[in-house]
């Protein structure tokens, strides 16, 4: 009987309720990410970078097993990440991927890893709400899943950003617990995992500002530990000092407020205003709710919402400037709303702290704790009904947003190129082009799939066009002119300036193909519905492009 009553008591306890809420949340989040990830056979999605990451993870693992760490990267010899200067700025992310890349089907392993890492990122935010007892946690979970369609999409990409969210949540918990020394190893791990470790420095700055506002003192420890950890991660690094050079290159290209000198991925350009609002409506509403509910007058209780106000606002501004931040701002906008509303949801009267000092002195005997407003009296049955109705209504509205975003994201992922896209062309090169040849690829963002399916050849540009531009700006501009079709006789330039005899292209570079067809220099050696491979002849012939 005692055991039975003990079990009943445990299930009624706050800790058990939170545990059940977390398990339910984990199952829901895992299901959502699984359904999104496996709507396509390809490594998800938007771009082909996931193919590079999983292939390089395989290469890294083979290098570790053979005692060659880090292995050489000879695949982009004309860029700043040539074999001598290559930097793996996702090193730990690739190490985290090793158990999945070592599977018989690395494609499947990459997809499972993506679903797992994305789920953990969302769950870390949900855990923070549970840990700090923000009421109606499951409603906030729906808000996290509904906050932004680009957030759902980008969290499913086989990339490192989910770890950035996880590490930021861990850091926030350490801030709130005033446990600062673990920030140093966390910063080291963050720096080894992803080059957006600067977000951790930004978070440390905002926490110190929050302490300064509420406690009127300068809290230097989080700043020192985080900066020291980041510096240590940069220096104690197998790629030092080249990693510093690459970091400077990234900052120079990506953080400029003007137009880029060379074309970069669309993620580094700003959103259109209506696109920004439409894609992240729940996140925008969460920011508005956070601002309206923000009450900084309580000292200790005010630190959390002040911190999230600063962090979420900064991320929102960055998202408006760069689409690339779309996976960071939305969940922290929801956390900002949750922690701003926390006192109100708990029934406290923060407006009491705005009363004149003499009035507060008169009320002091009626307040239950020094420096804290008292809870509102226990609601009546009518108020319970009203409160439940409001919460249920909010949950329904959020669910509508979620289903809209979920199906829109699912449809967008479904439209991604299939896994075998470029596979036939790349395998033809692997069998018919001598190993070690440099191939002129007409799109820099085709490189990841070419690297995945045909690692026996090297390529002119890939991963980021800035790598070619920073190595040789003149050559990069020539590459753009050739691929965009403004050079009428491209073959001698490709052969003499780039050192390539084979050209790999998708079938959408119409101007380039027109000039190639009329030049008399090219033979089509392979062609399908996805790509075309051409060979530059030794001598020009007066005939149109044809199959030899």
What are these regions (language model features)?
Residues 77-105:
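Short hydrophobic/aromatic helix or loop-helix immediately within or flanking a transmembrane segment
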Residues 42-49, 61-68, 195-202, 206-300, ...:
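Transmembrane catalytic cores of multi-pass membrane glycosyltransferases
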Residues 148-151, 169-174, 181-195, 200-203, ...:
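Membrane-interface alpha helices of multi-pass inner-membrane proteins
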Residues 168-182, 288-301:
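Membrane-interface transmembrane helices that cradle and orient dolichyl/undecaprenyl
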Residues 431-471, 496, 500-509, 534:
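Short periplasmic/luminal acceptor-recognition loop of GT-C membrane glycosyltransferases, typified by
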Residues 112-133:
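Transmembrane-helix motifs of polytopic, lipid-linked glycan transferases
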Residues 1-37, 383-394:
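Start-transfer (signal-anchor) and selected internal transmembrane alpha helices
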Residues 359-431, 444-447, 463-465, 474, ...:
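Membrane-proximal, lumen/periplasm-facing interface regions of secretory-pathway glyco-
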């Amino acid at each position: 009987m005692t055991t039975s009553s003990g079990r009943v008591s445990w299930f009624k306890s706050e800790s058990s309720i939170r545990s059940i809420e977390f398990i339910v949340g984990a199952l829901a989040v895992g299901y959502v990410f699984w359904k999104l990830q496996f709507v396509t056979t390809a490594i998800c999605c938007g771009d082909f970078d996931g193919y590079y990451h999983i292939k390089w993870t395989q290469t890294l693992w083979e290098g570790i097993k053979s005692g060659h760490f880090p292995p050489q990267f000879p695949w982009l010899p004309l860029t700043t990440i040539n074999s001598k200067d290559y930097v793996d700025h996702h090193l730990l992310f690739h190490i985290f991927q090793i158990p999945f890349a070592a599977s018989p089907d690395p494609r499947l392993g990459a997809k499972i890893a993506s679903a797992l890492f994305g789920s953990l990122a969302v769950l870390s935010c949900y855990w923070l709400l549970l840990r700090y007892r923000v009421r109606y946690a499951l409603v906030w979970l729906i808000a996290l899943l509904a906050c932004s369609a680009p957030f759902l999409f980008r969290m499913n990409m086989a990339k490192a950003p989910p770890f950035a969210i996880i590490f930021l949540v861990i850091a926030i918990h350490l801030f709130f617990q005033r446990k600062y020394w673990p920030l140093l190893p966390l910063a080291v791990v963050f720096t080894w995992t992803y080059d957006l470790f600067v977000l951790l420095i930004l978070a440390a700055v905002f926490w110190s500002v929050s302490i300064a506002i509420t406690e009127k003192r300068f809290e230097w420890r989080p700043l020192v530990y985080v900066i020291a950890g980041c510096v240590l991660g940069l220096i104690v690094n197998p790629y030092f000092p080249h990693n510093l050079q690459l970091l400077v290159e990234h900052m120079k290209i990506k953080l400029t407020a003007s137009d880029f000198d060379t074309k970069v991925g669309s993620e580094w350009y700003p959103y259109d205003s209506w696109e920004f609002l439409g894609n992240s409506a729940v996140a925008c509403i969460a920011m508005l709710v956070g601002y309206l509910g923000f009450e900084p007058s309580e000292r200790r209780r005010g630190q959390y919402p002040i911190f999230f106000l600063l962090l979420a606002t900064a991320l929102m501004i960055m998202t408006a400037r760069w689409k690339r931040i779309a996976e960071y701002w939305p969940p922290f906008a929801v956390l900002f709303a949750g922690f701003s509303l926390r006192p109100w949801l708990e029934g406290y009267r923060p407006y009491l702290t705005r009363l004149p000092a003499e009035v507060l002195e008169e009320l002091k005997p009626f307040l239950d704790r020094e420096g804290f407003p008292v809870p509102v009296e226990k609601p009546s049955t009518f108020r319970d009904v009203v409160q439940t109705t409001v919460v249920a209504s909010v949950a329904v509205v959020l669910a509508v947003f979620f289903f809209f975003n979920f199906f829109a994201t699912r449809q967008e992922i479904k439209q991604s190129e299939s896994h075998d896209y470029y596979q036939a062309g790349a395998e033809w090169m692997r069998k018919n082009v001598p190993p070690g040849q440099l191939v002129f690829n007409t799109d820099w963002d085709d490189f990841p799939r070419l690297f995945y399916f045909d690692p026996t050849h090297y390529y002119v540009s890939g991963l980021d066009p800035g790598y070619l531009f920073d190595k040789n700006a003149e050559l990069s501009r020539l590459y753009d002119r050739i691929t965009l079709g403004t050079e009428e006789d491209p073959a001698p330039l490709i052969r003499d300036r780039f050192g390539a005899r084979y050209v790999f292209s998708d079938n959408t570079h119409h101007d380039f193909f027109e000039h190639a067809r009329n030049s008399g220099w090219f033979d089509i050696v392979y062609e399908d519905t996805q790509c075309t491979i051409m060979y530059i002849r030794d001598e020009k012939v007066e005939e149109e492009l044809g199959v030899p």
